[in-house]
């Protein structure tokens, strides 16, 4: 309040909702309850609630966005797409958690930024906005697409033990 900002946009994740079943006709909505399944998603859900509490207590102009998986320029190198590209270009094994059938909705970073800009200028204070790409792919399909695009062999795929609390699908 002291800085007189016109609006605070809190960037969160769809992981705070937990896991969807594999029926691709259902998606998270702004009324889906928070059900995080990992310490990471629990920390994000906690931060969402903290932001909401500050907004209510101090009458702050706040929006919360919950987006799906981003991809695009300058992504952190440990994320699936840049990691896969780096490993393949160096003829190293690409780790795939479990059977690779985890489904993610992919959203280009430009589209995410565009949505944030719209919310900044037209969003209703206090609202939560879900931002998705309606572009669901399994992790294995993403990796195979990159491998084939670069012209390498699927023998570079190495299935590794799945992470604890790893949601099968969120979108």
Question: Model-predicted segments: where are they?
Answer:
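Active-site loop of short-chain dehydrogenase/reductase
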Residues: 3-8, 20, 60-61, 93, ...
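Flexible, glycine-rich beta-alpha linker
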Residues: 17-18, 35-39, 63-80, 103
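C-terminal substrate-binding subdomain of Rossmann-fold SDR/epimerase-dehydratase oxidoreductases
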Residues: 82, 88-171
